[in-house]
Swiss-Prot record:
GO terms for cellular component: plasma membrane. This is Tetraacyldisaccharide 4'-kinase. Transmembrane segments: none annotated. It comes from Nitrobacter winogradskyi (strain ATCC 25391 / DSM 10237 / CIP 104748 / NCIMB 11846 / Nb-255). The gene is lpxK. It comes from the Bacteria. Belongs to the LpxK family.
Amino acid sequence: MREPAFWRRPSSLLSRLLIPVGALYGAIAARRLSRTGLRAGVPVICVGNYHLGGAGKTPTVLALAGILRSLGETPVVISRGYGGRLRGPVRVDPDRHAAADVGDEPLMMARTLPVIVSRQRAAGVAPARALGASVILMDDGFQNPTLARDISLIVIDGDRGLGNRRIFPAGPLRAPLPPQLARTDALVIVGPGSAADDIAASIEARGGPVLRARVVPDEASVAALRGRRVLAFAGIGDPSRFFRGLRACGVDVAAERAFADHHPFSQRDVAALQSAAEKDGLTLVTTEKDLARLRNNENIAAFAQAVAPFAVTLAFDDETALRSFLMDGIAKVRRLD
């Protein structure tokens, strides 16, 4: 879904009118938060956020997986597979599955680490452990009560923050903020900005670490676009962040096309993008997540060959602190189990 503009405006009349509905939704969500889920038998690290929409969870999961591997762990991801038709549990195979089967984010992650898609997250534990998981990375699911979380890392965009801080549908929050804060073990703030400073202060007051991170563009992706004028398009939680990132790298973005998160690109979309690019001699560029959806759609796979990917990774300002936090947290879980 595309984020409504009023989610960022506390003064919006429509947002205020929806507050009673949000209160009901929030009461149900808060009750779900208090439930205890299945114990996995191995440490479960949840990477989530307080609100609907994108904040950088997938790059965070990939970065954590790399760190965990360097610590000698075997991480396996469990994802709901948003946007996919398969309920699972099923191991994602990039050579066999399409985004329509398992979702674009699991498909992208499965190119570098084992990913289990399971609509019921607890059902994904057995296949994850069968793959040798010593640690489970739960992609999203902070508000889902079916699988017990041992360590919860919340990701927030430093510039966008939490919008108007009202509960869905009056705002982007998935549940009331206080019970979410109380269940947060660490906060990851992606990018510059002060929109989450008060949240950071609250987490620090509870003794949790606040980890700053930044999106780092792949040098080869940037080099391939130098000297070219591009038409950038994206169907992610915050397309504007993608466009800003391109410009920050010196890429000449002549045109932008923003789509809703997880947008299923159609032949009509592809034709319009091709026409616009050809008209002005522009190179098409998109995110790795969007390209995963394009490549695995047999009707438009040929179009994907002409699109340049813009790959990014997440780098933590203090990776040593993160490594210590993960090692201590995992060791504590194992002592208790």
